A protein has these predicted regions:
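N-terminal export leaders
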Residues: 1-2, 6, 10
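Extracytoplasmic/secreted proteins, especially bacterial periplasmic and envelope-associated proteins
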Residues: 53-60, 64, 106, 110, ...
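Extracellular/periplasmic catalytic domains that process cell-envelope and extracellular macromolecules
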Residues: 31-35, 84-88, 107, 114-116, ...
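Aromatic-Pro/Gly-enriched surface loop or interdomain linker
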Residues: 26-91, 98, 217-218, 225-278
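An acidic, glycine-rich "communication" segment
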Residues: 36-39, 129-228, 242-247, 251, ...
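Short alpha-beta junction capping motif
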Residues: 91-140
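Structural recognition of the beta-strand scaffold that forms the well-ordered cores
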Residues: 41-42, 90-95, 120-124, 154-157, ...
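C-terminal segment of classical bacterial N-terminal signal peptides
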Residues: 17-24
Length: 278
């Protein structure tokens, strides 16, 4: 218990530093058929505009996955924390808004079970364009409030050797509509064994249970039913390049959560084989 409290406290300290053509997405009862097909999900915040963009973002990312990988997601799902099952979804996107209510005790229990069982929640404060490092933005403070009763582990800025940087595409950063200074992931244990500077990450098969940032990823992924982007990203060619990198980050996220530390294992194969021969 003390260890959990300590990890949660460390996570909250980090959080404190952070700075459409379709009917609105509404809370819904998740159909049991989702269990047999992969679908991306987002938390319904109660803000219609934010929820619509979250849905459109996951629709765009689902299309990107379909055309570029062997993953064939079905339509995204809008989930109500109080009523819907979370375990059906490998990734849940949670946009932060100031007005969304704090979950109930029962909903927090579901969230913590999800995090401990291999699920990944992407917390997006969507404010990297205005929030600077060292000053808590309003959405950052709201995230801190929402995360208070969640079993979030100790966090660190995603290191340059993190599997997220090479799960499918090779990436140096993780932009959305905005480019923030840091994206936070679970910290490697202090005593983690190092091979060529890279720690073995064994929790949940090496998958961080949370990714936290403010880059408005759904805004960059969002498409209309025609496939056209819904929101501008940057200007001209540079903006389109940023949108492409945001899409690549989305693909890496899905490949990462579905394959665990497979890419990390590949990096460590020579050392592992050497040890097996000893």
């Amino acid at each position: 218990l003390l260890g959990q409290v300590s990890r949660s406290t460390m996570a909250l300290i980090v959080l404190g530093l952070m700075g459409l053509d379709e009917p609105p997405a509404h809370a819904q009862t998740v159909d049991i058929d989702v269990a047999s097909e992969l679908a991306l999900a987002h938390i319904v915040t109660g803000n219609t505009e934010v929820d619509d963009i979250a849905y459109a973002g996951l629709r765009g990312l689902s299309d990107t996955l379909f055309f570029r990988t062997s993953i064939e997601p079905q339509a995204p799902v809008s989930i109500n924390l109080e009523n819907d099952e979370l375990a059906l979804f490998p990734i849940i996107y949670w946009p932060i808004t100031l007005e969304q209510p704090r979950p109930s005790v029962e909903a927090y229990a579901k969230l913590n079970t999800y995090l401990r069982s291999g699920g990944l929640i992407i917390f997006d404060t969507r404010d990297a364009n205005v929030a600077g490092f060292g000053s808590a933005s309003p959405n950052g403070r709201k995230l801190q409030e929402l995360a208070k009763f969640m079993d979030i582990p100790a966090l660190e800025p995603a290191p340059s050797d993190h599997v997220l940087t090479r799960a499918f595409y090779l990436l140096q950063d993780f932009p959305g509509r905005y480019v923030g200074r840091y994206v936070w992931v679970e910290a490697a244990p202090i005593d983690a064994q190092q091979v060529d500077g890279m720690p073995f990450r064994n929790l949940n098969d090496g998958v961080t249970p949370v990714v936290i940032g403010g880059n408005d990823w759904a805004g960059a992924w969002a498409t209309a039913t025609s496939g056209a982007p819904l929101l501008p990203v940057g200007r001209g060619f540079g903006g389109e390049r940023q949108r492409e990198l945001a899409n690549r980050f989305g693909v890496n996220l899905l490949m990462y959560v579905l394959t665990g530390n497979y890419k990390s294992d590949q990096v460590h194969v020579p050392d592992l084989l050497e040890r097996l021969g000893q």
